[in-house]
Amino acid sequence: MRISHTLLNASSKFRTVFDFGERQVAHWFPGHMAKGLKQMRASPRKVDCVIEIHDARIPFSGRNPLFQENLDVRPHLLILNKMDLADTSDKMSILKQLERDGVKNVLLTDCLKQRDTSVKKIIPLVTDLIENAPRFHREENRSYCLMVIGVPNVGKSSLINAIRRTNLKKGKASRVGGEPGITKAVLTKIQVCERPVIHLLDTPGVLPPKIENIETGMKLALCGTILDHLVGEDIIADYLLFSLNRPQRFGYVERYDLETPSDDIQHVLKCIAVKLGKTQRVKAITGVGDITVRMPNYTAAAYDFIRAFRKGELGKVMLD
């Protein structure tokens, strides 16, 4: 949205650094993920190519180092999914940085889109990577096996379904959900292509037990790879406001009927609660006894603010 010079001048006083205080990011490594990682480590011998999928809004943050121990033994393709939610105006700089980090094969996708042209490129690219790998032995009627890995809620199951939809014209094979960790067990082989015959394994996303720093953890939480209540909707909402104000993404002002951009999360949440009618009854103690008053429901407002961001309703953002 367009913002006047007066408003831009006001925003120049906003925070340039986010104060995390003494907060600690949740240690989130459920049992099924540890089991999945153990099985994943035992699988590369059966796998011809590893497809790593990650959120395009955080192309560098949170890529799991535990995965990378397993990537060197087989060809590797990085898919940055949810590109419809990401500001990719600086795409070339991102690709160059990834190449410096040793990642040469990258595709940007929107796997929920019914006809994403990038999804059509996956099987030809993977086939080429496998057949040109040093360890490849050509055999008649050979079938290939792929493994999809990534942190929670980046679209692994959506990717599998998109590949099947594109190459087999078949329906869903993997359950899809908006919460991290919905794929609870390493699945058996799922066929995704007939020519050549390609099967694919789906694994649980495995978030590393130790996150590099608190800001990396907050970016992961904002993108929904950590269950909200483990971090706190209030802190996620505040970090979201900070992340929108920094690049002057002020779409929330018009959406929630604010007069100007704000750096005060309590003020923003109050405006959201009023706009959406999110209130709650609370008891107030007065000189004449207890009375019940209606107050803004800040938790419900924070939830709507975060949900709107994750659905792309506050504009495209690059967090890294």
UniProtKB/Swiss-Prot annotation:
Pfam entry (one): MMR_HSR1
Stored InterPro entries: G_CP_dom, GTP-bd, GTP-bd_ortho_bundle_sf, GTPase_MTG1, P-loop_NTPase
A GO term from the CC aspect: mitochondrial ribosome
Subcellular location: Mitochondrion inner membrane
Species of the source: Ictalurus punctatus
Membrane association type: Peripheral membrane protein
Record keywords: GTP-binding, Membrane, Mitochondrion, Mitochondrion inner membrane, Nucleotide-binding, Transit peptide, Translation regulation
Function per UniProt: Plays a role in the regulation of the mitochondrial ribosome assembly and of translational activity. Displays mitochondrial GTPase activity.
Family of this protein: Belongs to the TRAFAC class YlqF/YawG GTPase family. MTG1 subfamily.
Domain spans labelled CP-type G: 37-209
Binding site for GTP: N81, K82, M83, D84, N153, V154, G155, K156, S157, S158, G205
PROSITE patterns xref list: G_CP
Protein name per UniProt: Mitochondrial ribosome-associated GTPase 1
Biological process according to GO: mitochondrial translation; regulation of translation
Gene: mtg1
